[in-house]
Amino acid sequence: MDYQAVRKKYTLYTRGAGILTMVLILCVTFAVSDIPMRTGGVLVIVAGLALAIYLINKWYLSTVAKLLHIDLDFTSWKQYIETNKEAKRAILRLDAATSEVSLSYMTGDFETAIRKAKEILSRDGLQVQYRNFLQSYLIRSVVLSQPELSREELNEMMGELTITDPTLAEKTQKMSVALYDLTIAHETNDYFETLTNEYKYPQLEIIYYKALNAAIKGDTNRAHELLRQLAGEDERLYVVRMGKELYK
C-alpha cells in the first residue's frame, strides 16, 4: 500500500464518519421527542464523531510515517510531495517542500537539497522547527557535495547556525564534523559508532559511515562486514551507492 492508497482510505473514512454522524443526528432528531434526551443524544453522537476523527487521524499519520521513514517507500515519498505541494493549506505545501529536501539528501542530489533548503529558509515567518530542520540538512549537504571545503569554512558555517533546539544543534555540529573528517579529511571519527535510529535511512547512513571509519582505520574485515548489510538496499540511496563503491 502506497501513500495514495492510504490517502484514499483516509478520505473515505473521514467522509464516512461525517455522513454516519449526520444520519444518526437526523434519526435522533425525528425519533426522540423529549428535548433534553434529544440534546443528550446529539452530544453523544458529536463526541463519538470527534473520537472517530481523532483515531482516523492517528492511524493516517502513523501509517504515512511508516511508509516514508520506516519502509522508505520511494513511490510514497514522490506521491506525498506531488500531492501536497499544491495543497490548499500552507503548512502542507511547506511540509512537501521540506520533504523534497529530505528526499534529495537521501538520494545524493545535494545541489537540489541545498537550493531548495535556501529557498525555503529565505521565506519570511518560517516556523522555527522547519528552520532548524532545514539548517541541519543544508550544512550536511554542503559537506557531502563540496570536497574542497576547508575546515575553517566548515567552522564558519557552524558558527552561523541558528538552530534553537539544543539537542538538534549539538547533533548537527557533531555530525557535520564527522562527515567532514570521514569524507573530506579522510580521518577517523567515532561519532557514528554509538548511534541508533528507528528510521531506515539514518540506519543505513550509520552503517555506511561506520564502515568508512573502519576502512580508514585499516580494519578491512569490519568494513566489509558492515557493508554487506547494505547489499540489496535500493541503490537510489546515496549511502548504498557509496557503500558499493567502498566495497570494491
Segments (PLM) and residue ranges:
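Extended amphipathic alpha-helical interaction segments
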Residues: 166-170, 176, 180-205
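N-terminal topogenic membrane-targeting module
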Residues: 50-125
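Hydrophobic/aromatic side-chain positions at a characteristic register within alpha-helices
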Residues: 68-69, 105, 142-143, 182-186, ...
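Long, non-transmembrane cytosolic or organellar matrix-exposed soluble domains/tails
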Residues: 194-248
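Alpha-helical repeat scaffolds
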Residues: 76-84, 110-122, 146-164, 186-199, ...
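Residue signature of alpha-solenoid helical repeat architecture, marking inter-repeat boundaries
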Residues: 87-93, 128-131, 165-170, 201
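"A position-specific structural signal for the A-helix of alpha-solenoid helical repeats
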Residues: 62-63, 92-102, 133-141, 169-181, ...
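N-terminal alpha-helical membrane-insertion module
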Residues: 1-78
